Amino acid sequence: MTKQELRQFIRQQKQQQPALDANAILLRLKQHPRITDSQTILLYCALPDEVPTLELLERLTAQGKTVLLPRVISDKEMELRRYTGRADLTEGAFGIMEPVGEPFLDYDSIDVAIIPGMAFDHEGHRLGRGKGYYDRFLSNVPYIYKIGVCFPWQLVDEVPTDEHDIRMDCVIS
């Protein structure tokens, strides 16, 4: 199956899924040692078909952790900005809520990245939406521990990969 065929398959599966409760996934994330032991965490603002993260954003921020979110700045590039609260989010590219403020450039301080995807396999391979934003960013910071996060129906036997695709260190579903 090609990447495009798998994306289409996942879109069809999504339509057949009941509204899923993400609480168990979020609990596993909150309890993961890489999250509890980290000070600086890259997260994401969820699209409707992704595991919701707003509660996790608020919780981690309340714990005094630095939470970073991506902001798309061109067709090929994203940068990170610090999450400071819901009031400082604005709708950005692709309808994704993005933080305002100054770019965060201290990539060496990032302990863990929580990454969404359309599909993942048990080897940590990720199928994104086809734009390559995360793969390009993560290729520059290979030392960051990467956690893929998805609903159980997004976990598949095999994700087709290309040389530039970045593998997750673990997947939580």
At which residue positions do the language-model features occur?
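N-terminal active-site beta-alpha-beta segment that forms phosphate/nucleotide-binding
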Residues: 1-108
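Conserved phosphate- and dinucleotide-binding cores of soluble alpha/beta proteins
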Residues: 76-173
